[in-house]
Amino acid sequence: MARRFLFIGDSLIEFFRWQKRFPDVKVYNFGSAGETAEGLLSRLPNIIDRVKSPDLVMIMTGTNNIAMEDYGFLFTYEKIIALLQKHYEQATIVMTSLLPIELFFLGDAVPRVNRKLEDISRSTNTVYLDLYPLFLGEDSKANGAYYEADGVHLSKEGYEVWARALEASVLPSLG
């Protein structure tokens, strides 16, 4: 039976054709534009009812939270992980870092949040996929080639960087 991947989170998950990129697996894309961590947590029971026994679960959430200057979502993120681990005991759970975004009021918020996400990953024994440095240009700002004009959503090239990182660092361990 083909491996099963569950991708959950915000528009950064939703807007890519993961199934086309990974044709040898069954991909369940439950990304939702505008999603916050709280929104994902509220949708999670329905997702768990619909997707049984995935081999891999990848989460990208929090970008919309920090864009609204909501930094309390990390507690919600821990609840998401706990629920996934309870229902998908055999799955490899991958927490992605947030990506660099150029919103003037954020300052160093994304790197600070990413350090907290990495701590959560370590304490919950999940895989942390640090995409942040891969999306920086030589000027240590978001590499414009990887983004759409809005500076938040990814271009085809940006999604390819993400997919290659997943292939290189996570998929080999699935066997």
PLM regions: where:
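Alpha-helical cap/lid subdomain in secreted, periplasmic
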Residues: 20-22, 26, 42-175
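Serine-esterase "nucleophile elbow" of acetyl-processing enzymes
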Residues: 1-53
